[in-house]
Amino acid sequence: MWARTLQHHTRNGQSRRLLGSWANLDVTKMSGANPAQAYNLVNGKWHLPAKSKTIPDPYNGEEFVKIPDPQSNEVSDYIKSLQAVPKSGVHNPLKRPERYNLYGDVCSRAAIELRKPEVADFFAKLIQRFSPKSYPQALAEAKITQRFLENFSGDSVRFAARSFGQSGDHPGQQSNGYRWPFGPVGLITPFNFPLEIPALQVMGALFMGNKPLLHVDHRVSLVIEMFVRMLHHCGMPVDDVDLIHGNGKVVGEILQKANVRSTLFTGSAKVAETLAVQLRGKVFLEDAGFDWKVLGPDVSNLEYVAWVCDQDAYACSGQKCSAQSMLFMHKNWSAAGLEDKLKTLAAKRNMKDDTIGPVITWTTEAMLAHKDKLLQIPGARLAFGGKELQNHTVPKVYGAIEPTAVFVPLKEILKDQETFKTVTTEVFGPLQVITEYADSEVNDVLQVTERMEAHLTAAIVSNDALFLQKMLANTVNGTTYAGIRARTTGAPQNHWFGPAGDPRGAGIGTPEAIKLVWSCHREIINDVGPIPEGTALTQT
């Protein structure tokens, strides 16, 4: 559990003493008896509304954090702050271009800060307190964020906003394409990556010249507050970002009343579609990820592939938008004993080292009920797991089950729409569906992937060139790994991560993703002459 991790990684509070003044809380001392207090930020000022609400510790239920709970009559400052931002943004290629350099400098300083072991350790432990995962998984968030900041240090921010020129039809004419900001924007992100997702997205919004209203799931939002405080310490103007804790309904009201020009939402498909209607389509979405993996006919590296499958399905207790939700095994893999190896690996996961732990958005009862519903499908069987974790103190508002897999025959998955809907329901926890197929059923596998609604990540585990060609040519997932080392999880800073097949689809992490989500194209055609003498001014 997290307490053991803290004990292992902290030596007499040394890391705490080395932190800068921006880190105004002690991760090790947050408890029901000593709750931490989060603050809202608007127009550069930290403040508290009249009410706060408490958040239960995922491990023991203690109310260990107080979160601001602003009401509808308390958010006028947020609305005015966003309304004060022009459509042309805080900066753009023609207005205050020195701010591109400013953010290159901020990134450089922030990367240096996050490179400090005590700072990375602080964020890793803070993440563990709110979004339970193992220390290596939590530390990876800090490391990825640090690498992202390194990537955009120096001139890289203005390089990301690079314009282009095109010659015209006559002397004095030239067209120039610019990446133009939206101005006032919204940014809403979920609980499962409380640092990496909001940090990378808010920086992208700022790079392009927008002013974002930042809202992270209130159950984990203290993490991003600490990141914003660190950015202030590293030179970011204090009024460049507004941060609001609290409930999503009030945030939605702010976005509507302020008439923000665009909003990035990462989270559930249901909320995404509701928000798209409320904001009249002015959204980018990175929503539900019912992600699949296909193991091709060529069996090799069995131990490694089994390990990756286990990591994809159960790391962070399955609470990744890229987690492996369905595994298609070629019969050759079944014959090689893959399922038994998955069962053995799953059995090793435990709460002592946080390789399995609390589930934030699904209760134990809900996950086990879904497991039972899957088992009602003809031919379905429990491959492993399927029980509540033993001897835990996870509060009932959260969930705690063993790593679980239910085998469902491929023909049954395709039998009718109701069964298909049940099988492809995303459980944001340690539960996956597995099935198998023969050479003659490859098209059936493709039919399943075609009928799915979510197209975020996928993995095709094979080095068979013809098999890869067929699978890649007939699928659409925006982030697809292919080859014997393919995985579904992994959203590093060095490649695009996002869905495909939806014009609202958002990406994260790369210059291309930032330009797509946080800027639009503007063309300016300069036509200064000279006007040729004797030009016939004929009306047409």
For every predicted segment, state its role:
Residues 128, 159-305, 501:
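Rossmann-like NAD(P) dinucleotide-binding subdomain of oxidoreductase/dehydrogenase enzymes
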Residues 193-195, 220-221, 250-252, 271-272, ...:
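Flexible loop/turn segments at secondary-structure boundaries
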Residues 266, 285-287, 383-391, 459-463, ...:
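Beta-strand->loop->alpha-helix junctions that form or flank phosphate-binding loops
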